[in-house]
Amino acid sequence: MEKKEKSDEVIRLTDIGKSYYIGKQEVPVLTKIDLTISKGEFVSIMGPSGAGKSTLMNILGCLDRPSRGSYKLDGEEVARLGDSALAYTRNRKIGFVFQSFNLLPKLSALDNVILPMIYGNVFKKERRERALRMLDSVGLGDRAYHMPAEMSGGQRQRVAIARALINDPAIIMADEPTGNLDSKSTKEVMEIFSFLYQEGKTIILVTHENDVAAYATRHVILSDGHISKDIRGPLS
């Protein structure tokens, strides 16, 4: 049975633009982006290299601010948030998964997963218990004390997913999460995202691979910094 999408709006971008400057010359990267994402959607963001995918993801993830336009997250205007409030929003509402894993190499899998909870004021004993449960849920209960260098790419990405989930964010943002993985690990990681979608998480996935994007139920295609297509249902 197909999962019914929820209708509650979690993200609304209105006339978003982003430019960088080389000297005095403006270089537009995103232009007139209008996008609404509802709670519980699984959205892929696709497009050729240089289309603005990662820039858009950075804005959605509150890692960067747009040059113009409005971004509302859970109904709150992001531009009105100061740096501290923005950091809190990132830590509590959004879980990030990156292509390069972004694990701290001198920390064990367990300690990497614990890290976001330190900023969330979770008691030390509870941190460890929650992190162990989360690692077990992604099939890495027996790798908790391994260092990143002692794990495969697929295992490291599953640690990164566990870390992204540890504060129970409503939104998961994944930027090319399978880019460094073989086909077997790609399937394992994408099945985790599918499970999270079925559990009601909102997932936003940047990818250039059609077989990875096929796990999503909606596909936003970027071209030259603007949305050229917004496809609901399978990719044609």
Please give the residue ranges for each predicted region.
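H-loop (His-switch) and adjacent beta-strand-loop-beta switch element
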Residues: 219-231
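ABC family nucleotide-binding domain
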Residues: 9-222
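ABC-family P-loop ATPase nucleotide-binding domain
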Residues: 1-19, 229-236
